[in-house]
Each structure stands twice: as structure tokens, then as C-alpha cells.
A protein has these predicted regions:
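A cytosolic small-molecule/anion-sensing beta-strand core signal
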Residues: 46-47, 63, 82
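Short acidic-glycine-tyrosine-enriched beta hairpin
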Residues: 56-73
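Short histidine-centered beta-strand/loop micro-motifs
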Residues: 23, 31-36, 54, 79-80
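Ligand-binding loop in jelly-roll beta-barrel domains
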Residues: 72-94
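Short beta-strand segments in beta-sandwich/barrel cores
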Residues: 21, 30-31, 48-53, 67
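A short glycine-rich, His/Asp/Glu-containing loop-to-beta-strand
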Residues: 2-32
Length: 94
């Protein structure tokens, strides 16, 4: 089989180059501030709406068809404004 359809949640890919995390957040649910040193982050909402906070200084509203890219050194926290499905791609910087 050449492809794999990913439907589970949590860390769905984790190798030396990339980690992919699939999350489901209920409305009002939050992810506390944290960072990912050594990674470039691509954060995308598949369904729903969230606010992403970087270093507690910048706020990014995200909905489907939008991708937020940022350096993993920044501290990220998240709040789900609606029930949301999210994919986060953490790429090792070289």
C-alpha cells in the first residue's frame, strides 16, 4: 500500500524529520503555553475555529483553509472558539 489515511488523534507521525499531531478540541478547550525548539511549525484547522497566541503577544484567529507558520522557539497556546479538528506539522529545522 502506497498511502495511509490518518484518522486517529495524537501523534500520528513521528520520525527524524517531522512530527504530525492531530487534535480534536471541544469549544472552550485550551492548550497551555509551550514551545517546540528546533522545529518550524505549520498549524492548520481542518474544521472549527481557534485562536492561537504566540509569546502571549500576538493573536491569530484560524479557520479552515488558513495555515499559521511560526518558529518553534515561540511559546504557543490555543483556545477553541468552536469545536475544532486541527493538524500541527512540526518540521525539524536544518
Amino acid at each position: 500500500m502506497l498511502g495511509k489515511i490518518i484518522t486517529e488523534h495524537g501523534q500520528v507521525v513521528n520520525n527524524k524529520d517531522i512530527m504530525v499531531v492531530h487534535l480534536h478540541l471541544k469549544e472552550g478547550e485550551t492548550i497551555p503555553a509551550h514551545n517546540h525548539p528546533g522545529r518550524q511549525i505549520f498549524f492548520t484547522v481542518v474544521e472549527g475555529e481557534v485562536e492561537v497566541y504566540l509569546d502571549e503577544k500576538e493573536t491569530y484567529p484560524l479557520v479552515p483553509k488558513k495555515v499559521l507558520e511560526f518558529d518553534g522557539e515561540a511559546r504557543i497556546s490555543v483556545k477553541a472558539l468552536k469545536e475544532s479538528d486541527i493538524f500541527v506539522y512540526l518540521v525539524v529545522k536544518r
